[in-house]
């Protein structure tokens, strides 16, 4: 417990093109070494590719992909009487979004396409179609929670 109280959550500004805070968070996640311009070019380029491939608004496809990636349950280690149990807990909405964005960027970087723009676009498309590494990660997390359902009564 901090003595001075909790810090306030800073709100991000909505991005100028899509007027969406989640897109800004994606840009911040993609950004390396403070190069926001490069990150914006990657994200907006990827969104253009997504719109061209699906013939739907890119933001719509992105939101669908985010919904498919966001985890509902996760496991947290809890030590009780010398044994460590993996206790399933519900994921808070802010953390859900943060995890989904983190997985999307991590697995985009790990892909084999030539440019980051292509990688991100294809990861978004895969996630929207319920395939891809980030969706698999969410499903693995849910399987872990399901397997450890017996320890749910040790909740925090």
UniProtKB/Swiss-Prot annotation:
UniProt cross-references to InterPro entries, sorted A to Z: Ribosomal_uS7, Ribosomal_uS7_bac/org-type, Ribosomal_uS7_CS, Ribosomal_uS7_dom, Ribosomal_uS7_dom_sf
Keywords: Ribonucleoprotein, Ribosomal protein, RNA-binding, rRNA-binding, tRNA-binding
Gene Ontology cellular-component annotations: small ribosomal subunit
Domain of life where this protein originates: Bacteria
Stretches of the chain forming a coiled coil according to its record: none
One Gene Ontology term of the molecular function aspect: rRNA binding
CDD domains: uS7_Bacteria
Signal peptide: none
BP term (GO), one: translation
Gene3D superfamilies referenced in this protein's UniProt entry, alphabetically: Ribosomal protein S7 domain
Family: Belongs to the universal ribosomal protein uS7 family.
Subunit: Part of the 30S ribosomal subunit. Contacts proteins S9 and S11.
Function text: One of the primary rRNA binding proteins, it binds directly to 16S rRNA where it nucleates assembly of the head domain of the 30S subunit. Is located at the subunit interface close to the decoding center, probably blocks exit of the E-site tRNA.
HAMAP family: Ribosomal_uS7_B
Protein name listed in UniProt: Small ribosomal subunit protein uS7
């Amino acid at each position: 417990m901090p003595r001075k109280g909790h810090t306030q959550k800073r709100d991000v500004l909505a991005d100028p093109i899509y007027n969406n805070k989640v897109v800004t968070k994606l840009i911040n996640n993609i950004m390396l070494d403070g190069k926001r311009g490069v990150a914006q070019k990657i994200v907006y380029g990827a969104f253009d590719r997504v719109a061209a491939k699906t013939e739907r608004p890119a933001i719509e496809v992105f939101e669908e992909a985010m919904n498919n990636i966001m985890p509902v349950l996760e496991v947290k280690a809890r030590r009780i009487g010398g044994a460590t149990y993996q206790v399933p807990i519900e994921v808070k909405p802010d953390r859900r979004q943060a995890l989904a964005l983190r997985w999307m960027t991590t697995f985009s970087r790990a892909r084999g396409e030539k440019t980051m723009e292509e990688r991100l676009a294809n990861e978004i498309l895969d996630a929207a179609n319920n395939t891809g590494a980030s969706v698999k990660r969410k499903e693995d997390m849910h399987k872990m929670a399901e397997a450890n359902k017996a320890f749910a009564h040790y909740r925090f």
